[in-house]
């Protein structure tokens, strides 16, 4: 069986709106990453950009289960000796909650140039205000069992 190849005329991009209120971070990120990849479409092609745009609102109300709020750290290195920096999740949530969701989704996308293009289709906002009413985003309910 041959791999389906999507042409430019067949490409259709939709906009989805996701409310992150009281959703576990991992469940939210995995389902958003699936939409960004286009896995929810019948014309999914793994080597093409066929996903949809996703707007995540209320990122400051996302949940972590267990004791991860105190124990989870985001680490990065500046490139200089002794330049390991770490930020706790509680600090990240209070200061940059949109970045916490973006990092979680980024980790679930492919680690190549196609994954970087998919990440540009993601918009994350701390509150319910977003400037994408002109795109007429469709509100979808994700499975956020807890």
Regions found by a protein language model. Name each.
Residues 106:
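Acidic, metal-associated active-site segment
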């Amino acid at each position: 069986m041959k791999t389906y190849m999507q042409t430019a005329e067949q490409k259709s991009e939709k906009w989805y709106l996701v409310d992150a209120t009281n959703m576990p971070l991992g469940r939210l990120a995995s389902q958003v990453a699936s939409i960004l990849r286009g896995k929810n479409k019948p014309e999914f092609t793994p080597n093409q950009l066929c996903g949809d745009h996703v707007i995540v609102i209320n990122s400051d109300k996302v949940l972590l289960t267990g004791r991860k709020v105190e124990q989870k750290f985001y680490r990065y290195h500046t490139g200089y000796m002794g330049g390991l920096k770490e930020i706790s999740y509680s600090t990240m949530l209070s200061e940059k909650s949109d970045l916490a969701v973006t990092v979680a989704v980024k980790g679930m996308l492919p680690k190549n140039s196609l994954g970087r293009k998919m990440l540009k289709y993601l918009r994350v906002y701390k509150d319910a205000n977003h400037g994408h009413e002109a795109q007429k985003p469709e509100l979808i309910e994700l499975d956020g069992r807890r």
